[in-house]
């Protein structure tokens, strides 16, 4: 994988390309794109040395993680995949926030399947849930290691 882009360390050592690719707009929020267009953009980013890709279950919902998963299949080595939790979805619709331990563990398990990977490199909270103490959320995240 060419490294034409500078790299940075996040936190205690996770190395990412200084330029990351947020994939949200490939399947949600902006002008709709065809899945193969998004996959082509991701493939080209990898060719250029981008290693950091961000998605979330809310994007699509679910479709963005699937798109990224298809695009990185067979190319996972050296990539850093980030996804997020924190929304409550019912029948594919956002109905509020939910950062409860049960929800974040469910989101993690389901995201692994949609992405087609064995581990998520960066899993973080998309929105603060005022009904769940942050200590409970962070404690549940620590259990995922």
Region spans (language model):
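Generic enzyme active-site microenvironment
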Residues: 52-55, 82, 119, 124
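Glycine/proline-rich, positively charged
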Residues: 91-145
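Hydrophobic positions in alpha-helices of CheY-like receiver
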Residues: 72, 85, 141-144
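Active-site beta-loop-alpha junctions enriched in small/polar residues
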Residues: 24-26, 56-58, 84-88, 125-128
């Amino acid at each position: 994988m060419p490294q034409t882009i500078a790299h940075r360390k996040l936190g205690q050592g996770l190395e990412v390309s200084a330029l990351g690719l947020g994939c949200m707009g490939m399947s949600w929020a902006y002008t709709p794109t065809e899945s193969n267009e998004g996959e082509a953009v991701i493939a080209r980013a990898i060719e250029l040395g981008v290693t950091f890709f961000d998605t979330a279950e809310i994007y699509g919902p679910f479709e963005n993680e699937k798109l990224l998963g298809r695009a990185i299949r067979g190319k996972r080595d050296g990539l850093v995949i980030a996804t997020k939790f924190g929304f409550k979805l019912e029948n594919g619709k956002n109905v509020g926030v939910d950062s409860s331990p049960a929800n974040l563990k469910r989101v993690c398990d389901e995201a692994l399947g949609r992405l087609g990977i064995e581990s998520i490199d960066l899993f973080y909270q998309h929105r603060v849930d005022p009904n769940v103490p942050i200590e409970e959320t962070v404690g549940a995240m620590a259990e995922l290691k």
